[in-house]
A protein has these predicted regions:
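Conserved AAA+ ATPase "SRH/arginine-finger" region at the nucleotide-binding site
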Residues: 167-178
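Short glycine-/polar-rich loops that comprise or flank the Walker A/P-loop
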Residues: 17-21, 137-139, 164-167
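An amphipathic alpha-helix signature
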Residues: 33-40, 176-184
Length: 226
């Protein structure tokens, strides 16, 4: 689905080489604090393998989290970030965007289930994020969501902060013919057989929803002997 598509694009060599890519899913988030924690954790996890220089740049910007990030005598980072470390979400959010603006490479940030921010306890979260996004020239954002009507209201209603601030893309279901070709090809490569009618049944049963179709086809693949 949309998550797999975004992650797939992030793996393109020209993207991996020239950008920092961050992906967070905020479906379970209930507050700005949850969002800030998810974003902070993702940035740390992405930067750590890159090296101490990249991580140190984030560390210098995010003063409110410095107690959770330490460096040993060899300069290797140690991360111990928990939700409880986000004591002042608004402050940490400001610091994160300061980092994104100053990062040594452009940043791509994907936020999945973005519609969740409409239910946060804090007021004006949409307006706050819109302001930061608007003024962050070193980053581009992908806002994905599964509740199409909520996402539509956020970006198409004139009174909402994100009105006309993005290019909208609706992802339709992958055509049945593509699933047939894809599934039968992989079964055949493994010396297995898959009837096209079975693919049709799975597709119709789950109304073209990618996650369910792939899950069932994968199960059938593992159950089918060569």
């Amino acid at each position: 689905g949309k998550t797999g598509l975004i992650r797939h694009c992030f793996q393109f060599p020209e993207i991996k080489q020239d950008y920092y890519t961050f992906f967070i899913d905020i479906y379970d988030s209930r507050s700005l604090r949850d969002l800030v924690f998810a974003l902070s954790k993702e940035i740390l996890e992405v930067l750590k393998p890159i090296g101490k220089k990249a991580l140190h740049g984030f560390w210098e910007c995010v003063k409110s989290l410095q107690a959770s990030i330490s460096f040993d005598v060899n300069g290797m980072p140690s991360l111990n970030l928990g939700l409880g470390d986000i004591q002042a979400p608004a402050t940490t959010l400001d610091e994160i965007f300061r980092y994104l603006e100053q990062a040594d490479k452009p940043c791509l940030i994907a936020i999945d289930e973005f519609q969740q921010i409409t239910g946060y306890a804090e007021k004006n979260v949409e307006a706050t994020l819109r302001t930061y996004v608007q003024h962050c020239n070193n980053a581009r954002f992908i806002f994905a969501g599964s509740q199409r009507h909520v996402m539509g209201n956020m970006f198409l209603t004139p009174s909402r902060p994100f009105y006309q601030s993005v290019s909208m893309m609706h992802l339709e279901s992958i055509p049945l013919e593509e699933y047939m070709r894809f599934a039968c090809m992989h079964f055949k490569r493994a010396g297995k057989e898959m009837e096209e009618s079975a693919v049709t049944t799975v597709y119709q049963q789950f109304e073209g929803v990618t996650w369910y179709i792939q899950k069932v086809l994968n199960t059938l693949y593992n159950m089918t002997p060569e």
